Amino acid sequence: MFTLKIFVYSCVAFFCSLFIFGFLSNDPSRNPNRKDLE
């Protein structure tokens, strides 16, 4: 049960980070030079 909870939390954190980085990389006012991949 504890392992399943860690797996679920890691998946949620992963998708949240993908959403946040995708939003920031598509926002020219926050990232005009697109240097988020460095």
Curated annotation (Swiss-Prot):
It is a single-pass membrane protein. It is found in: Plastid, Chloroplast thylakoid membrane. The chain crosses the membrane at residues 4-24. Keywords: Chloroplast, Membrane, Photosynthesis, Photosystem II, Plastid, Reaction center, Thylakoid, Transmembrane, Transmembrane helix. It comes from the Eukaryota. GO terms for biological process: photosynthesis. GO terms for cellular component: chloroplast thylakoid membrane; photosystem II reaction center. The keyword rRNA-binding does not apply. InterPro entries: PSII_PsbI, PSII_PsbI_sf. PSII is composed of 1 copy each of membrane proteins PsbA, PsbB, PsbC, PsbD, PsbE, PsbF, PsbH, PsbI, PsbJ, PsbK, PsbL, PsbM, PsbT, PsbY, PsbZ, Psb30/Ycf12, at least 3 peripheral proteins of the oxygen-evolving complex and a large number of cofactors. It forms dimeric complexes. Belongs to the PsbI family. One of the components of the core complex of photosystem II (PSII), required for its stability and/or assembly. PSII is a light-driven water:plastoquinone oxidoreductase that uses light energy to abstract electrons from H(2)O, generating O(2) and a proton gradient subsequently used for ATP formation. It consists of a core antenna complex that captures photons, and an electron transfer chain that converts photonic excitation into a charge separation. This is Photosystem II reaction center protein I. The lineage of its organism: Eukaryota, Rhodophyta, Bangiophyceae, Cyanidiales, Cyanidiaceae. The gene is psbI.
